[in-house]
Amino acid sequence: SASQSAKNAKEMAVCWINLFGLQSLQTGEIGEANQREVEFNTFKVVEFVDFCCKQGFLPVVACTPLGCDLNSYVSDAFGDATLGGIERKMKERGVPFLNYRKDERFQSELSLFTDGGYKLSRRGSLKYMKILLADVQSFYETVINNKSLNA
């Protein structure tokens, strides 16, 4: 229900604030310790993407959708403070960073999530994977299907 989704989203936001010692998810101020973790995680993602590129793979970094209730607690400034470094590093490398966090196709359908907008339901996962696959194919200008995957 809509009221349960809103309640779950609020509980998740409060949980994240407490878990990471944040004042809010509405600001880019994440604190020194969290900033170090973000920088370390960014380094690891870049390291992995660079490895994939050297192996001849076509890497993609994606941020999954959040529902509208959960998105109401997370500002763009917070998103930039936590994911912006990865997004910028991928852009430098010509690797797609596909950010579906606020994707309109997921904002008004509660049935796409099993909770307040964080965990995709089976239906939400299928919808997301179809969108992701189409976007990856478009970015790399290649068809991805069972035949191409087994080549």
Q: What do these predicted ranges mean?
A:
Residues 1-54, 148-151:
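Secreted/periplasmic serine-hydrolase-like ester/acetyl group-modifying domain
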Residues 19-23, 62-66, 100-103:
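Short loop/turn segments at strand-loop or loop-helix junctions that form parts
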Residues 32-38, 73-76, 114-119:
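Second-shell loop/turn segments in exported
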Residues 40, 44-47, 81, 85, ...:
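Extracytoplasmic/secreted proteins, especially bacterial periplasmic and envelope-associated proteins
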Residues 49-76:
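Active-site segments of SGNH/GDSL-like serine hydrolases
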Residues 66-101:
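Substrate-gating cap/lid alpha-helix
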Residues 105-115:
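Short helix/strand-capping connector loops at secondary-structure junctions
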Residues 113-150:
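Histidine-centered active-site loop/cap adjacent to the catalytic His
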